[in-house]
Swiss-Prot record:
Belongs to the UPF0215 family. Pfam families: DUF99. It comes from the Archaea. Coiled coil: none annotated. Disulfide bonds: none annotated. It comes from Thermococcus sibiricus (strain DSM 12597 / MM 739). This is UPF0215 protein TSIB_1161.
Amino acid sequence: MIRKIKPQIRVIGFDDGTFSFKSKIKRDKTILVGVVMKGSQDVVGVVTRWIEVDGRDATEKMIEAIHNSRFKDLRIIMLKGITYAGFNVVDVEELSRETRMPVIIVIRKKPDLQAMEKALKKHFSDAEEKISLLHKAGKIKELIPGKLYYQAIGVSYDQAEEIIRLTQKSSLIPEPLRLAHMIASAVMSGESKKE
């Protein structure tokens, strides 16, 4: 739990790069980018790892990136959803426990969990494990009606909302996540994509 939220709170925001259908079949990798910021203003650094498309290593790679980084004053982990590189689902409870930090998941469109479960059951032998991780992420809360949703682990909903607002700059998406998305898509496709 965070006692006091400062405007310059140290946050790491993770997003993944683009990938093709062909890379899903071949089980290729895509880049995972973490952008470290002080609030919404100053970029402090960037960490990267490679994760398997539709794999099971996103959680491990995020933990590794945080533990092996020089950024020891991080206070919050932000995720742009919990599925990376297709259906490489993050175990947010493990991520929070192993890093000893709260996790805030920010989502632009409210996920259709039933459709996700159906797709997982149809295409993955480990579907039940992935579905379990989707449910472990907690209740989906609406911050801006129809436009922005979030989930929070290890931090109150009020604090999560305050942190989301503190880290927004020129978009509804918090700046660490917006920049992670731009960097990851530029690495994979040669040019940054719209958020």
